[in-house]
Amino acid sequence: MSANDLSACLWRERELLDLLAFKLEEEQFLLTTGKSRWLQYATREVEQVMERLRAAGLARSVEVAILAEEWGAPQNATLRELVEAAPDGPWAEIFTAHLAALTGYTEQIRDLRDLNEHYLRTALRFIQEAQADGSSESGTYDAHGESGTASSSAQIFDLKL
């Protein structure tokens, strides 16, 4: 039955959207804690989930077209249009619940994306301001464990060591 197949596709898509929200929250955690070392991996994982979502979206489109033909709806019907064309029975309610969940995930993901973008822009602005400062001190240490900045204060050495 095509309605079952479409419902299964929608469940897979919901699981992927949930995973995407999790990955975006991971990315946000890395941004807010300054763990930029791991950011490339988190970004790659977000991209991988996005690829899986594209494939799931394509599978959903195929299932919608099959079910739309079965129910007499336009072949390129949206999920909302499919709900309107649904025959008597539980499918209208099931697909309405899927639509509400997908809409909720979309809003949550959009908010996470916007917040992550804000954090990235803030970090970029901070870096640009630091570079414009003209300060050449990097705050790193050389091979001898020294900061590389010359000290103007007198130093006492114990030559007996």
Task: Locate the predicted segments by residue.
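Extended, charge-rich alpha-helical scaffolding segments
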Residues: 1-82
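Short terminal interaction segments
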Residues: 78-161
